[in-house]
């Protein structure tokens, strides 16, 4: 799976975290592992321009998704022929997201992870224009984000334990006899 990130926002963000959450969602949603995804991070002026051009709405927004193909909710871009398929583009605005994060009482990284999940779900055909669609999409979004966070916490604790084990083994070598 290829995920390309281009940060043109001027704000330092963890690109590896964005890739991690996108890769997790794509895997959990059974998308073809050869799928390609592009993520672009823009400043508010560029996002406002994109928002007006594509949605005819003034001002910036947090995330926009541009699927390569129209997909049904839960659908996949699997194709019978070999080769990668282009899932689409997710455009994020970290500056706008930072304001939302502050209002919600969490970090920019947490907000961008949420928006990445949201963007991938849009690429897979999910929408929230109608109340029933919103309920389904937001429940799935919450579930996927919680699972990804749990996986990150587990990996962190495993890394910590491995580091403790390594230090303990290093200390025990002092007592080894030749």
UniProtKB/Swiss-Prot annotation:
Localization per Swiss-Prot or TrEMBL: Cytoplasm
GO cellular component terms attached to this protein's record: cytoplasm
Cofactor: Zn(2+)
SUPFAM superfamilies referenced in this protein's UniProt entry, alphabetically: Metalloproteases ('zincins'), catalytic domain
Binding site for Zn(2+): 118, 122, 128
Pfam families tied to this protein: YbeY
GO MF entries: metalloendopeptidase activity; RNA endonuclease activity; zinc ion binding
Highest taxon in the source lineage: Bacteria
PROSITE patterns: UPF0054
EC numbers: 3.1.-.-
Name of the top EC class for this enzyme: hydrolase
UniProt cofactor note: Binds 1 zinc ion.
Keyword RNA-binding recorded: no
UniProt KW Phosphoprotein keyword: no
Similarity field: Belongs to the endoribonuclease YbeY family.
Protein name: Endoribonuclease YbeY
Origin species: Mycolicibacterium gilvum (strain PYR-GCK) (Mycobacterium gilvum (strain PYR-GCK))
